[in-house]
Each structure stands twice: as C-alpha cells, then as structure tokens.
Amino acid sequence: MIKRKIWCNLCIDLVAFTSEIFKGAVFQSLDGIVVSANCKLRKIFTLKSKPQDTADKDAVYGVPFSTDEPTDIIPRSCQLMTDVPHVTQLLNMTKLRQTEIKFGGHPLRSAESDQFINRGTSITRNSKNQDVCHIAFGSKVLGPPPLSGRRNNMKISSETVRSVGSKNNRSCQPSTVEKCVNGTEMSALLIPESEEQGNKENIHQIKQTVPIHAANLHIMHPHPPQEPSADKNNNRRRLRLKSTSRERTETPSGSSSGNNRIEDKASTILTTVSQQGAELLNSGTLGPQSPDQSDEWIFPENADHISYLASSRQSLLLGDDSCNPSHLWLEASKESEHDQQAEESQSVPKDIFTFSSRPRSAPHGKTQTMSPEELSFILDLKEDNSVTSRDTQSEDDFYGGDSSEEGNHSIQGSRGPTTGPSELTQLTLESLLGKAAKRTSKEYLRSAYTEAGATESQDSSMEQIDRNNFEMSLLPTTCLSPTGRRCGSCQKTPEPVIKAKDLSAQQVPASLNKTSLKEISGERLSSIPEASEYDWRNYQPSQMSESELQMLASLRWQQNEELEDAGTSHGLSASQVDNCNVSISTSSDDTTTWNSCLPPPVNQGRHYQKEMNPPSPSNPRDWLNMLSPPIVPPSQQPAEQRPDSCESLSVQGEEDLSVEEDEEVLTLLYDPCLNCYFDPQTGKYYELV
C-alpha cells in the first residue's frame, strides 16, 4: 500500500487514528515518535491540515480524492528537490477502509469492533466490577486487570482474532472455536507487509474476511517460551524477509539488543492456523507438516491464502557444550540441503513473503569456553543458497549499524561456497592471532606471531632476540671511551643507588675548568688491568614477559627521577639547554663543543612548561638535565678522595655560570668503567683535583 523504492511524503492523520483507536478521545499533542522502518528517513514535521495526495489514488484506492476539504502546503524547507522523484501519500482511516474493500474484504464497522472487543471481557465481568477500568499499555481498557502477567486468560471470540504487539510479547491462551454466524466463515486479522517494516508497530490493523471450513479449523495461539530467559528485556528475534528479488533483515519492535537466544516457540505477531505436528491449513485444504521445517512464516497479501506458522524443532545453539563440532557441521549441511529442497518444492506465490529464522551465533560473552573448532562456526555457520552474498547481513552487523539495505557488509555475513572445518579453523586461528597482535606491540611481537607454526626452539630464540631489541630501545644512546679498561677503585666502591645497567643512562658531557682537573699519566692507565667489556645482555633474565619489561622500564624512569630530585641537577634552565649544541652519539670521536658561557636569559619563568615535561628517550637533549658522575655518600667514599668532593659536585653547575671567559673550559665525557673523565678532542684522561 505504501509506495516503495521512491521518496514519499507519508502524511499520517493522527486525529483520525486517535478517534478510531480510542473511542471518544481527541488528539491533543504528540509525546514521541518511534520509527522502525527499514528505509531512509529524511525529516519529520507536522502540518495543521493534510496536503494534496499525489499518489495513484484512482488505481490504488478506487475512489477519487475529495477536494472539498482544506489542504496545506508542505513547507519549502521540508520539500524535496524537483529533480528527485517523489510522491505525497496520505494515510487515514478512509484510505485503509478503501484498501480493505479493494482486496476482497468488507470493512469492519466501529460498532462491530466494539462488540467483539467487549465480548471477551464481558464474560469475566459481574455486577460489582462492571464499570471497573484498568490501564494496559498506556490506554484505558474496560474490565478488571488480569490475575497475573504471565497467564493472561482473556477469552477472545473466534470471529475476530486480534494480535497484540507489545514489548512484553505476552500471548493469549488458545481459544475454543465457536460456531460462526454462517458456520463456514470467520474473520481473521491479517497484517499486511506495510511501510517497509512489515508494520511492526501495529499502527493500524487491517481486518479481512476469509472463507474457511470451520470443521477442519484448528486455532493455535502463540505461547511464550517455557523457560524464561535471564533478562526479559534482551529477547530479540531476527526475522529475515525474503522475496523473489532481494532479502532484508528485520527486527520486531519492542525488543532490545543483547540476548541472541533462539526461541522455538512462536511470537505474538500473527494468528496461526496450524497445530504442531498435526494439520496445516492452506486455502481450505490440509497438508502434512514437515517436522524438520525451519521457523518459516508466510505472510500473504491477498485473500486466497491463509497465513500459517510452522513451528520447527530446536535450532542449533553454539553455546551448548554437548554439541560436537563434527555433528554441528553435519547438521548444518543437512539443514541447508533440506531448506534448498523445501524452497524448490514449495510453490510460493509471487506476492508471498517468507519469514525464516536462521541459526544464530552464541552470545558474545560465552565464546571464551569454546574450542577453536567451535569458534570457527561463528564465521559461517550455514550456507544460504537462495540469496546472493551481496545482500546478506550478519546479525552483529545488523545490531551495530543502521537498518539500511545497501551498506553494511562484514566478514561474518558474507556467504560463500561451503568450506570444511579445517579451513574454518585455520581462518579462526588467523583472525585470533591478528587480533592479539593488534593489542600488543606490533614491532615486538610481529615475528613471534608470523612464526606460529615453527618449533619451540625457534620461537624461544625469536622471543629472546625481540626482548633484547626491546630493552635496547628503552635506553638512550651512550658514549663510552675507546678503551674498555676498568679501574680497581670502581670495582671496590659500593654504589647501592645506581646499578651497573643504569650507568649507561647517566653518561652525558660535562663542562669543567681545567684548573680543577688533574691529568692521569699514561703509566697509571697502562697499570690498570684489562677487564672484559661489560655486556648487559648476559645479566638479564632469560624469560621475561612484556609486562615485566614494561615494569623494568618504569622502574628506570622512577629511579632517574629520584636521582634528579636528590640534588644531582646541573643548575641549567631549559633555555640554556636549548642553546647548547651537544649531541650524544655512540662514537667518542664527536667534536662538538659546549657553549656554556652564554649569559642567563632575562626571563626564565616562561620556560617552566618545558621543565615540567619528562625526558623522552627519542630526544637526546632531554637527557642533559642529569649529571654524569654519581654522588656517593661520604661514608662510602674511597680513602683517596677528599671529603669535600661531594660538595664540589653539587655546586658545580653554579660555578660554570660564573666562569670567566679567559679560563679554558674543557668538554669532557665521564667514563663509569674507569671512574674518570675523557676528552674526545685530545684523547686525554682527567680526574677531579
């Protein structure tokens, strides 16, 4: 009835619907609008009067449009462009009744509908509570409220079978078949496919008379599931609407996202005229019902066919631990073959849409307990031979995105040729490895994940190499002396604060006066015994996880900050650090000089923001605020050092600022192995006087 595949200005007469649905009520205001159509929505606006209907009124409704009533013009801001094909369609009770007459049924008068509504409730009424009303779903209903919400004992006449669409999905018990007026006819309510979503909101209901032999009629009403789910608000049924040209996925109104549990019982949308395992009525003839038929609802749009519901056996549940993957695979293949044969054997008319409920994946929270073989079935559980892979949408994709038909395609929703369990397992493992690699460091774990099929020895060697590279990236580049000699005093001096592996992080150039230094003779250097070069890799644990490496890195940062807070600052501001042209390199042949004779800037307060930033390992200039030689407590100093050497180190930065220009200043590098200073320009060694 609603125009499809074209932009439509759908105008709904709220005044007419209000007065028809709620007797004696007058429309005043609109509280909210719920749109559940599978279409593109552009704008929602209100008009005081109805606009001119430009749809095919003579062909569709049979009665020409009356022009004596006042009309309104759609505002310019809400009008569509002139080059866009569109129609304006008015929807009121008059149009609905004309549509019922056109499709073979007589319109139901308001008096008859009141009689049918009140007949079921008048049985339970007596003289005491004759005028008692209660509120049901926001509307006032005559009669006392039901005894309990789970069992609603409303007796409904067989002449009018009403389907109640509500958020609770409550259903009525089976009503007994009474004798009709003429004995061979009953009035069944059919909801046509309307407004692109099958009219899930039940805005209007079309009543239609269908001739049926009453003797062969078995009426079954839908029941709620026997086992209530954990969360009532999380029930969601997925309905797939199949036609001859395309497929679209729909969800009933009132259901919220979440629980994807498969319910084998029928929902409360349609009147059913079949009995489970008994008889199936179609156009007055009975046919055998297949026990393996999968949840299919056929909605006819003409009076020649009667809607039926074939309730099937319980569908596949992936969350069931008792299911064997091989059995699941066999059952899925059998069901796909059976569905293909059933679709070929059924002669479905052109205007009939079939709703089928496919097997769905388990809830997201339960997939941790599955094996990889069971996880593989989430990717592609069942092949759908009736539609192309382009029109298929997965369930998760439908929940997460919008409900348009064009766009949303994911890996799970794409249907292809049937693959074996081994190939699916391989795909699942690759996807799991890909997800895990994204969570961790890409450079650190890339080789370990690409070599997943190699032996354990190869894996262990790869991980060890990666850990070494990872730890090397945490440390700044160092500058050592050309010789790897170690003096005896360095080995004897206990330094509990600074560890050996942290000394490389402390090596920065320092500017010292030549008068405060004493050159070390070559004989003393030659007398120092040769020591093997220190390799920090030999002293690392063999097996360390990524979290432990990160913990060690954070400990190094914390230790460096503690050293900086302990008084080892060189006394330079951030502006003076920026003015120096010193670069730290791994070679000791660097010829850069330290220009520390610059006067202090006038305004040093504006650089406090730079001083607050922590040093980054990528920028060597950030490491210049840490002084090279470690401060040793006086109780732990060697005997040859004077007690005031610690004080000379602490005030060294202030002395550098007051150095006169005629004094010679040397740029030296501190060597922790030799416990002395090295001049890269002259190649000489110095120690403090």
UniProtKB/Swiss-Prot annotation:
Bias (Low complexity): 584-593
Composition bias of kind Acidic residues appears in 394-405
Q: Bias category Polar residues: which stretches? A: 251-260, 343-359, 409-421
Protein name in the entry: Protein CFAP20DC
Question: Which superkingdom?
Answer: Eukaryota
Q: Where is this region: Disordered?
A: 241-263, 333-423, 584-659
Under InterPro entries, the record lists: CFA20/CFAP20DC, CFA20_dom
